[in-house]
Each structure stands twice: as C-alpha cells, then as structure tokens.
Amino acid sequence: MIKAAATLKSLQYRQNSLTDCYGRLSFGPVNPGQGLTIGNTLRRILLNDLPGIGVIGAEINGVQSEFSTLPGIRESVIEIFLNLRELIFTPTATCAQKVKQTKPFVYAKLNSELKIDNFPYVVTAKDLHIPEYEFVDPNQQIATILSPTAAENFKLTLLIGQGRGYQSWKKLPGVPQLMDQRFFEQFDSTQTNSKSVTFPIDAIFMPIRQVNFTVQEHSVDGEYIYFEVWTNGSINPFDAVKSAAKVGMKLMTACLTTLQDQQVYLDESKLPETPNFVQVNYNKMESESNFDQIFIEQLELSLRAYNCLKRANILTLADLSQQSFRDLMKLRNFGQKSADEVRAALSTYGIELKED
C-alpha cells in the first residue's frame, strides 16, 4: 500500500502555435495495478467529456445553397463554412459565468464598423463582433474579399454554442427548435435582393486533440502515470487533466449516492456518529445541484411549450422547478398538454412542480 499522496506535476509545456499546445505530466504514486485504470479513465474523459465552444450555425447574405459561390469572394460557401468550424473560442473573463448560466447560444456578426481600403482583404476572426467570447487565434482566416462591391454585400451572422465532443446539429439541445423558428435575424430588405437561408453546422467542440499515457513502475514508490496531452489552445494541458479528474470524481460520487440510497435497512443505532464518505458526498451533491445549468432546450419540449416558457423568462430547470401548475397555466398559450409535457420532463430529473 502506497502511503505517499499522489500528485499531478507538469513536466513539460510547449506552445507550437496559438492553436497547438503540448504538455507532459506525471501523476503518482499509485498502488500497483491502479495506473492503467486511472490513466485509461482520464484519457477517455479528456477526449470525450471536456466542454468546448464552436460555431453551430451560419447565415450569409443572399446565400440559399451551400454549393453557391459569392461574386467577389475567393472561397466557396462550403469553404467558408469549413473555415468557421475551425474557429476556437474561450469565454471572456467578465462574461464566462454569465454565458454559462443564461446563454446557451450567442450571436456573432461581422463588425459593422469594419472599413476595407485595400483589396484583396482577408476576413479573419478578429473582424467578428462577439463580446461574450475571445478567439484563441484572432487571425484565423474566414474568407477573402476581392472587390468593394463584394465587401459591401458580404454580411455574416453566426450562432455559437457549447457542447462536448463532435455533435450533429440535430442532437444539440434546442438547436432544431431554433431553426424551426427562423431564429436568425433576417437582414433588412434594403441590404439584400434575395432571401437568406440559415445553415446548421456540425460543430467540433473537443478542446483535446490527442492524449497518450504510459505507466511506469518504481521499486519504492509504486506506479507513476505519464501523460502527453495536445490541446487546441483553448485550455492548457495541466488544467485539462485537472478538469478531467473533476468529471471522473463527479461520476463516481453519483455511483456512491446510489449505494447510500440502498442502505435504508441498516440499523440506525449501529451507524457511526461521524458521517461516512458516501453521506458527506451525497449531501454535498444535493447542496450543489446543477439544475441552474440545465437549460429548457435540453428538455426536448414541443415548440409551443418551449416558446411559452422562453417568453416568461423561464430559462433553466431551476427556474422551472420554482413554478406551480397554476403558475404555468397562467402563461399565454400554455395548456394542459404543455403542462403534461413539462411534468414528464421534470420527472426524468426526479423533481416535481412546486405545490400550489
């Protein structure tokens, strides 16, 4: 049994470019046989479960097909969309918490004050106006404008969201409903001679590009795990491994709470006075409920129910749990069918509507 506490250490850090970071880390000592289990778990979490930010929809002035070409623009529409998928974001320090709590999606538009004097002009990430996020690489290319007429007509609107891994837009919470509602702003008729179409984009949210690990035995200390982590620059490798460990702890704590629920037949007189590990973590999870981070888009409600709640500023599961049946029935266009949908959705999270 290893008595020394395991620690995470950064052994090497290298930034090859703004969007390519490399880190080598060690974790240990751990007991013989545990290195492979811990290393494989953290590797899978790093590749699959860390959140990221990406472009999930785009609208270009006058474009009705992704196979179109734009007069005076070097790239085709498909090439522009592929460039948009490569944009990497990080929340600004002042807006990170606000965006996390209240804005599952945000807009980005081409800066209206952008003045182009020389052609060809390369439109880059820094030409977009988006106060909620920062670009990891402000010089990431989007499109090339070849003429003043093209510069005047080129209008771009993006929808940016958060997620994990690679996700089709059809599976992103709330996005299909937003597309059905024509969520994007339509440009003024004086700015366009034809109708614009909103194009969903399958986003790549993964901040981790690659992870390797090896386990080495030390005759005295036990096993050490050595990680090699490559990221896209939105997070450094050391913080990425720490975040992965937190995700793993949260998952395991959920398993422990299930075990705690199964101990109802124990003789309470024989339980220790000091709360055990399971009880402490169960109480902690109850007090740190994340219902305020679950948005109503994730409940997969009908469009009518979703719109009614959105108009009433009921944005999260926490907001919804504070409503009673009578409160919901007072909402405009909210009927019995919508109420039944909400009840069913809440039941999947183990909560009910507030008592009248």
From Swiss-Prot:
Highest rank taxon of the organism: Eukaryota
GO biological process terms on file: DNA-templated transcription
Region (Alpha N-terminal domain (alpha-NTD)): 1-259
Subcellular location: Plastid, Chloroplast
UniProt keywords, alphabetically: Chloroplast, DNA-directed RNA polymerase, Nucleotidyltransferase, Plastid, Transcription, Transferase
UniProt keyword Plastid, yes or no: yes
GO cellular component: a single term: DNA-directed RNA polymerase complex
Subunit text: In plastids the minimal PEP RNA polymerase catalytic core is composed of four subunits: alpha, beta, beta', and beta''. When a (nuclear-encoded) sigma factor is associated with the core the holoenzyme is formed, which can initiate transcription.
Role this protein plays: DNA-dependent RNA polymerase catalyzes the transcription of DNA into RNA using the four ribonucleoside triphosphates as substrates.
The name this protein goes by in its record: DNA-directed RNA polymerase subunit alpha
Gene source species: Ostreococcus tauri
Gene: rpoA
